[in-house]
Amino acid sequence: MAASIIPKEVSLDETGHIKLFNKFPFEGVEVKDISLVDYITIGNGQPLPHTAGRFQTKRFRKARCFIVERLTNSLMMNGRNNGKKLLATRIVKHAFEIIALLTDQNPLQVLVDAVAACGPREDSTRIGSAGTVRRQAVDVSPLRRVNQALALITIGAREAAFRNVKSISECLAEEIINAAKGSSNSYAIKKKDELERVAKSNR
């Protein structure tokens, strides 16, 4: 990308690439879970997680959507938060700043590790007609693993921040750090373990 067409507000790293929120580089971020490589998009040098719904026009296209934008969109899931993209983006930005301070790592890498760690690999589904219904354990597709991981992370952060002195940004940062470590203090990890335990009993 030619330097002349990049606005002066956008800062570049040493290699001339754009940084997320003008602070966090995309370079060196990798998905360690081989099954999720095609479903966690690190980003293609966009300073803000906003593509104006470009990835919702076709089914399954959201798999190519930048993972930070998907996290931002998940924060808007409750009815009263619908459409507040600017607020959600600000929450994610502050959460990333907190993660960078607490871990001394790139927050993008921490988020990718958290999503890979708290997506359930096995779930249970209902099988049978109205008369006899039983539950059967099934494998979870990689896209659904990412979807559920993002939903669980944001639900955990929202519940932790409710009636709490801590802000939603602090709770989101804490949730992402705990999920990346695989800690049982994370709401997402606890829910994932619960789903997998129920699925195991229904094999």
Swiss-Prot record:
Protein name, as recorded: Small ribosomal subunit protein uS7B
Other comment: There are 2 genes for uS7 in S.pombe.
Assembly mode: Component of the small ribosomal subunit (SSU). Mature yeast ribosomes consist of a small (40S) and a large (60S) subunit. The 40S small subunit contains 1 molecule of ribosomal RNA (18S rRNA) and at least 33 different proteins. The large 60S subunit contains 3 rRNA molecules (25S, 5.8S and 5S rRNA) and at least 46 different proteins.
GO BP, sorted A to Z: cytoplasmic translation; ribosomal small subunit assembly; translation
NCBIfam families: PRK04027.1, uS7_euk_arch
Family: Belongs to the universal ribosomal protein uS7 family.
Superkingdom assignment: Eukaryota
